[in-house]
Swiss-Prot record:
Protein name: Inactive deoxyhypusine synthase
Lipid metabolism in keyword set: no
Origin superkingdom: Eukaryota
One Pfam family named in its UniProt record: DS
């Protein structure tokens, strides 16, 4: 027969009285020293009031009878003291206001953006900045150039994020997030861009190919072509206003898009067209290397535009907006410590990084401060 195994004795439950007794023993030493159990658990409290602002948000009760403009300004001016990413947006807004409206005449302002910023409605915002000469240099990928020009020939429409890509493709519609671009827009762009390439190659031929053409020169030629051939729609274009106001536009990945396809196929029938991106690296560095003034940047999104700008231009102040995460381990998502470690930023660079969607937060940063909102933020 198997020997019977005694059942395990149930664990003794602590009573409330025993728990209180145990807690009393653990804090006894602190009580004998004249301190409380609370201080023993969390450490001595220090008051940071002298160096830190108090957290508070929007008092909507005081805005019940306010106008829409007054309410909007109250919301925006409350961002710095709201906490979390709202505070970052508020700090970024204050720095953007300084960069755009309170800089010295010798300072240079750079704006780097990803192509989706032009595909969406931020194109109108960038156009305003170029029209008012608030930015001295724009940097983007190929899509950030061609999508701007394409909108002069056809509209980009609002769709939905979940629309079936295969069904749209069969209908001749391209989808960028929840934005829809008909194929006809790209056909229009091909008809527009090919004569630009022909004029560029003719200039190279006239010089007996002693000079090469930089992407920024092709972009400038595109601005001139918009002004000449599409006067009714040119004023909506960032490329046009940069051409008209003499603002540099650089696209280091100029062939990574529809323009690259067209240059590729163009060279089958028109041999000898040379596009030299190194010319633009020299121009960008010369622009940033002036003896007087500071280099100031607004970086919307990451990837190539951010990396190309920051690796070539030593910055004095930078505002960054990104949806990337540090876990990605790429330049698009790098936190400030990563950018300093990689040499993209100097330790002394004044920097504000916002984790958020630029389509939402950047327009808020452009709302000008009044004397009242500045006083409210300071309080």
């Amino acid at each position: 027969m198997l020997a019977s195994v005694p059942a395990p004795r149930p664990a003794k439950k602590d009573s409330a009285a025993s728990r209180r007794k145990s807690a009393s023993k653990s804090t006894g030493a602190a009580v004998k020293d004249g301190s409380s159990a609370r201080v023993s658990a969390s450490g001595a409290a220090e008051s940071p009031k002298q160096s830190c602002a108090q957290v508070h948000g929007v008092d909507f009760q005081s805005l019940v009878h306010a106008t829409q403009e007054e309410t909007l300004r109250a919301v925006v001016s409350s961002l710095p003291t709201t906490g979390l990413q709202a505070t970052q947006i508020g700090r970024a807004r204050q720095l953007v206001q300084q960069i755009l409206h309170h800089r010295s005449p010798e300072d240079r302002v750079f704006l780097a953006y990803t192509s989706n910023m032009i595909s969406c409605g931020l194109r109108d915002t960038f156009t305003y900045l170029a029209r008012e000469r608030l930015v001295d240099c724009f940097i983007s990928s190929a899509g950030g150039i061609e999508e701007d020009v394409i909108k002069c020939g056809g509209s980009t429409l609002l769709g939905q994020f979940g629309q079936d890509g295969r069904a749209l493709r069969r209908r001749g519609i391209n989808r960028i997030g929840n934005l829809l671009v008909p194929n006809d827009n790209y056909c229009w762009f091909e008809d527009f861009f090919t004569p630009v390439l022909e004029s560029v190659q003719e200039a190279q031929r006239a010089s007996r190919w002693k000079t090469h053409t930089a992407p920024s020169e092709i972009i400038e030629a595109m601005g001139a072509a918009i002004a000449k051939n599409h006067p009714d729609t040119c004023t909506s274009s960032l490329v046009y206003w940069c051409y008209r106001n003499g603002i540099s536009v650089f696209s280091p990945a100029f062939t990574d898009g529809s323009m690259g396809d067209m240059i590729y196929f163009y060279n089958f029938s028109h041999k000898g067209l040379v596009v030299d991106p190194l010319e633009d690296v020299v121009r960008l560095r010369k622009l940033a290397a002036k003896e007087r003034g500071r280099n100031l940047a607004i970086v919307l999104g990451g990837g190539l535009p951010k990396h190309h700008l920051l690796r070539n231009v030593p910055m004095d102040a930078v505002v960054m907006v990104t949806t990337g995460l540090e876990a990605d381990g790429c330049v698009s998502s790098g936190v400030l410590a990563d950018d300093v470690a990689c040499g993209l930023l100097r330790e002394e660079t004044e920097t504000v990084r916002v984790q958020g969607d630029a389509t939402v937060v950047f327009p808020l940063m452009l709302i000008a401060e009044t004397a009242a909102t500045r006083e409210g933020a300071a309080a």
